[in-house]
Amino acid sequence: MAGYDPKSIERKWQEVWAGERTWEVANPGQPGFEADKPKSYVLEMLPYPSGEPHVGHLKCYAVGDAIAHFRRRHGFEVIHPMGYDAFGLPAENHAIKTGQHPRESTNAAIAEFQRQFRSWGVSIDWTRE
């Protein structure tokens, strides 16, 4: 396929989705809330922000993302939030490994997760992070 540049095409659509706030869902009482529309909640296991995102994360979130897209296409209002399991031994070990305070190492890892998940095009409602 001559002239196909996936990075520019993906970047274009990611900017469109962000600009249109495509994956955001209004809460009751907010403009845009549709009371009669069926609701769905999709939540994958929360990742440990104790390192770099990897193909295992993509594998897990690809399934949840497919479910979220399927339900949207079938008329559901889908909440697909993001969160992190940032407590306990994995966070402590990562902080020790990086020589940083746990808050600093966790925040840096979360920033990398956000960057990578956006680049993958996962349909996360980032307002519900």
Across the structure, where does each feature detected by a protein language model lie?
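N-terminal, positively charged nucleic-acid-binding surface of large information/translation enzymes
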Residues: 1-129
